[in-house]
Amino acid sequence: MKKFRLFLLGLLFLSLFALPNVTTAQSLQFTLPVAEVEAYIEEDGTLSLYYILVFQNSPNGAPIDFLDIGMPTSAYNLKNIEADIDGQPITDVEDSPYVSNGFALGLGDKTIQPGQSGQVNIWVTGVQNVFKGVVNVFPFY
């Protein structure tokens, strides 16, 4: 059963990155040469997520000053989110105004300028209700 849950979780996260690699929104033009998500099911049933995202901003793109990150459920606490860009802490973490079940990271003076790149690492702990509605079926031998 644990393997099945991990398979479903892995499938969910793979689908997040099945979209085209080049993204354009308003005047933003960037690629994600690296987009990795590690998911850990904790002993208490919560989920911990570790994101590794490398943004390559186009020379013609606008500065990337905010990042909106989607979550698998709304049952998480903003205080359980730690993030950094190129090793420098990101302290502006708030609910996303654009992504339901998501949060926004304000990069402030760490904004990714046109033609530049930045690696963003995000650690989210205590995500709850990930398996809500999953039917547990045990074989009767």
Model regions and ranges:
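Bacterial N-terminal signal peptides that target proteins for export
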Residues: 1-8
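Lumenal/extracellular ectodomains and adaptor appendage modules
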Residues: 20-141
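Bacterial N-terminal signal peptides
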Residues: 9-18
